[in-house]
Amino acid sequence: MHRVYCADILLKSESPMNDFASMFEKATGHKRPHDYQSRLACGERQDKPEAEWFCGGTDCASRLISVPTGMGKTAAVTLAWLWNRVALGNGKWPRRLVYCLPMRTLVEQTRDEIQGWLQKLAEAYPDNEDLQRLAAHSPIILMGGVENDDLRREWDVYPEKPAILIGTQDMLLSRALNRGYGMSRARWPMHFALLNNDCLWVMDEVQLMGAGVGTAAQLEAFRNEFKTFPSCLSGLPSTTWYLSATANLDRLKTREWRNKERHATFIFELSADEKKTAVVCAKKTLDLRPNKKMEDCVGEIIQRHDALAAGKPLCSSLVICNTVKRAVALYNAIVNELTDKENKPQVLLLHSRFRRYERREQRNNLGKPIPPAGRIIVATQVIEAGVDISNAILWTEVA
C-alpha cells in the first residue's frame, strides 16, 4: 500500500493561539520573549503596534543566527517553527523540524527542553490536533544507542504529520546522504527522502561540527538546485538555520555557494538596541592568578563559595579544568576538604569519560534543585559547549 500525501500551502489551525508572546510564556514560563526571538517568529516589527506584531508570522528562509550564549536560541528556533507551522497553520513552513547537534549531551538537553515545552503547550491548547500529536510523538531522537518508544519509533510511516527530530550530526547527516548509520539499508531511501524534503534543518553549535557544517551547506545547495518538496510547488528554497554564538560566514562558502550570494537577511543577529541590554552588557569581574595551580586554590574555592552562599543562597560555582586527570584530582581534594564540614555544598564532577548510566545520573543531579549550601561543579571543557548551567562564580585554567 502506498501512502500518498500533499501539503496545502495554507493550513487551518483548529485552536488558534492568541499571540506569540502568550504561547512563549505558556511554553517557557518567561513573561516576555527577547526581541530577537519575536523577530525570528513574527518578522520585523517596523511600525506595527506590539499586539499586531505578536499576532503575525513571517517567511521561512535560511539564516545564520548569531546570538550570544545563554539568550535562548533553542527556544527561539523551536517556538518560531511551532508558532508559524502549528499555531498559524502556515503551510509554507516545513512540516518537520530537524535539530542537528554535535554532542550527545546537547541532544539529551535539547530533548528535555523541547519535550517540556510541547507538554505545556498541549495542556494549554487541548484543541490543537497537531500540537497534541507533537506532544505525544515528538521529539524523535536519532542518536547511537538510543531507542525511541512505540509512539516515536514509526515516525517515518506518517510523512504527512508534523514532527520534531533531534539527533547527532553523524546520524542525521548520514541519513540525508542516503547512508543512514545504525539502520537497515532497505530503509535508507525512506529517511533520505524524508530528511531532504519538507524539513527545516537547524544546525546548532556549528563551531563544534567540523565537516558537518560544510556537508549541511552543500546539501542545502543541492536541495535548492534539484527542487525538493515543497519548494518544487511553492518556489521557495530549501531552508537551513545555522546557529552559533561565534558565527563564521566563511565556513558556509562551500563549492556550491562560492559564486552565489545569500539573501540580504541571511545573517540574523541582535539589533543595536538589544546589544545594549543588561543581559548582553552584564559586568563581569575578572581576576587573574598567574603562576598558581588550581590544586592550590581548593581552600579559596570553598571560601569564596561559602561567602557567596551566605548572602545569596542556592548559588552555584563552576570550576573548569583542562584535563580529566586534573578535574578528578581537584574534585577529590574539594571533597576531602569538606569532609568535616557540617553545612557543606553539593560537589559534582563532570567529564567525558563517564559511562552512560553515570552520565544520566549526573545530568539528573544537575537538574535537581540546588541545596541550601549551594553547589560546586568541577568539570572539563565538556561543560563549555551549549550546556545550560547558570553559575555565580567561574574558575578556569587558562593554560
Task: Describe each region flagged by the PLM.
Residues 1-399:
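N-terminal helicase ATP-binding lobe
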